[in-house]
Amino acid sequence: MLVCYSVLACESLWDLPCSIMGSPLGHFTWDKYLKETCSVPAPVHCFKQSYTPPSNEFKISMKLEAQDPRNTTSTCIATVVGLTGARLRLRLDGSDNKNDFWRLVDSSEIQPIGNCEKNGGMLQPPLGFRLNASSWPMFLLKTLNGAEMAPIKIFHKEPPSPSHNFFKMGMKLEAVDRKNPHFICPATIGEVRGAEVLVTFDGWRGAFDYWCRFDSRDIFPVGWCSLTGDNLQPPGTKVVIPKNPSPSSDVSTEKPSIHSTKTVLEHQPGQRGRKPGKKRGRTPKILIPHPTSTPSKSAEPLKFPKKRGPKPGSKRKPRTLLSPPPTSPTTSTPEPDTSTVPQDAATVPSSAMQAPTVCIYLNKSGSTGPHLDKKKIQQLPDHFGPARASVVLQQAVQACIDCAYHQKTVFSFLKQGHGGEVISAVFDREQHTLNLPAVNSITYVLRFLEKLCHNLRSDNLFGNQPFTQTHLSLTATEYNHNHDRYLPGETFVLGNSLARSLETHSDLMDSALKPANLVSTSQNLRTPGYRPLLPSCGLPLSTVSAVRRLCSKGVLKGKKERRDVESFWKLNHSPGSDRHLESRDPPRLSGRDPSSWTVEDVMQFVREADPQLGSHADLFRKHEIDGKALLLLRSDMMMKYMGLKLGPALKLSFHIDRLKQVFWKRETILWSREGLSREVWPISEDTALGHFFSGMDKVFGSLSKR
């Protein structure tokens, strides 16, 4: 037994006659490694990397503009907090140190200060901004005042992407460990599927390999780290790396080693060995006899009398020993496990910080549209989830593809995203894959599915509440009288039911005046993120019937006929006869214009709108939200900046929209395709009436020409 109490004593162990894959301990070289494994490095032209690595002239504390990795539509101010090789460790100003991320110096996601404004954009607070959102402009001024800006000359142009995927299975490369992005490790291409490649880390096992596109900036050619000065980790010793990687090869067994500090951790699943030279509290027993013997699969792994527990704050992921990897075709499967690495800002994945759970329900009795097979829809589960939002989105989208008559049609509606789950479709005798966008909120899932279903013309297919038989049997007319009992998003029914092309003149008039085809103002004027239910009728049913009767007698040419309809219109739109509005109006606060409300008025409105929301009224004082700000609020904004849960945010969004309907009566008329455009009028009833008859003249004029 050898026990040492100092780092120098531990370093003396390196002289023992032991090697890792043919390289002396702590001296990994690609040349010897490639010879011993009979492997081929991936050619340089396979990668989206510069042939000559760019120089890194950045300095600690420099400021620059960077894309928020958790909200890719936002450009934020970032500070350089670390440097390694050709990479920068960045921290978004206004965020904490738990969401640091790494970018190459030639990444297109980093730009010098002023680039966003130059291109007409605005700098945004990062997701999870710790201060009040209203204080962001002042925070931005203080942050940039006197700060050292990264000069334009040290930024590099991003290299072009390869023309197509040149990778082949078994090629060697260097890849970023996405669980610990400050590590770059030797890896192997485990599988090639369309534009995607499977990255497997050499010498490690588990289910932590990852798929990425062939033009990912997280993979590098062999020798990249030696050129840039970055630190390349040696291969692990969890599994023996075969000389001839084969998809059919069996899972290799462990090989005992006397690597300086990995010995005690080698047989503990879920832990990763340390780099040579790192301090530790206690040195384990060194097993010198039979250093190269390989136990059989049935043999029990070596056990030590005492095992170190995990460090405080570290998370251990349980794994089953010798379990076959689910996705990797080679024996070298997982991304290096990192339980023993300190959980600093760069090691905590942002996805672990906030993982919203969502459940999406399927409406099997709804319209599936022309692209989806109703029989296949019936075979799907009643709901997807509850699970992480990204997983549920992937399941729902994949279900639409699998149930399509032609998968290519549904696949064409989707755009390549970044950071999300992978979906696949089979057409043209090939399997095609695509990354969905990263999901950072539950509302994003609902909006995404709304747009997809609208393209598929299968509205009312998904919802975030179970579809009851009562709801499914409601007609458009019944819904217009009863929709105040439902909250927006409670049953996620898609709007924008556009009028279809009609063949006969009578059908054209019915389509232009049918209540179910008249779209409400809130639907056309809604801000992004508002999700209405079925559109409320813009005209009372009696008005529609009367106009239809007048139209059936002939075209309205004379003044008398016009006066008849005007009288009937005003009669049905007189005060107190707004049948198309809800029977229960929101609090009016003495009839004042909501845009003139003070913060106290807004708090009173919240309390009176729903007593259950009274506990949230103080948030409006804290964030200084007056009437004008109230009218601009959306449910996703209330969740993101005010910290509200989904339910209260949807309720408040519903009451705010009803408030707009009461104070600003905007009439929206959905016309057919006969050369008429759809307009929204924030105007009085008399003016709207004039527009109505002007539009009627256009319709009848078009019909008379035929």
Curated annotation (Swiss-Prot):
Bias type Basic residues, positions: 272-283, 304-319
UniProt cross-references to InterPro entries, sorted A to Z: Mbt, MBT_SCMH1_rpt1, MBT_SCMH1_rpt2, PcG_chromatin_remod_factors, SAM, SAM/pointed_sf, SAM_Scm-like, SCML2_RBR
Gene3D superfamilies in alphabetical order: 2.30.30.140, SLED domain, Transcription Factor, Ets-1
GO CC field: chromocenter; male germ cell nucleus
Similarity field: Belongs to the SCM family.
MBT repeat windows: 28-126, 134-235
Keyword Repeat in record: yes
Name recorded for this polypeptide: Polycomb protein SCMH1
Chain residue ranges for the region called Disordered: 233-350, 576-595
Disulfide bond annotation, renumbered to this chain: none
Keyword Chloroplast listed: no
Induction note: By retinoic acid in F9 and F19 embryonal carcinoma cell lines.
Role summary: Associates with Polycomb group (PcG) multiprotein complexes; the complex class is required to maintain the transcriptionally repressive state of some genes.
Residue ranges with Low complexity bias: 329-340
Gene for this chain: Scmh1
Organs and tissues of expression: Most abundant in testis. Moderate levels detected in heart, brain, lung, liver, skeletal muscle and kidney and lower levels in spleen.
Assembly and oligomerization: Associates with a PRC1-like complex. Interacts with the SAM domain of PHC1 via its SAM domain in vitro.
Pfam families in the record: MBT, RBR, SAM_1, SLED
Keywords: Developmental protein, Nucleus, Repeat, Repressor, Transcription, Transcription regulation
Organism: Mus musculus (Mouse)
Location in the cell: Nucleus
Limits of the SAM domain: 597-662
Gene Ontology annotations of biological process type: anterior/posterior pattern specification; chromatin remodeling; heterochromatin formation; negative regulation of DNA-templated transcription; spermatogenesis
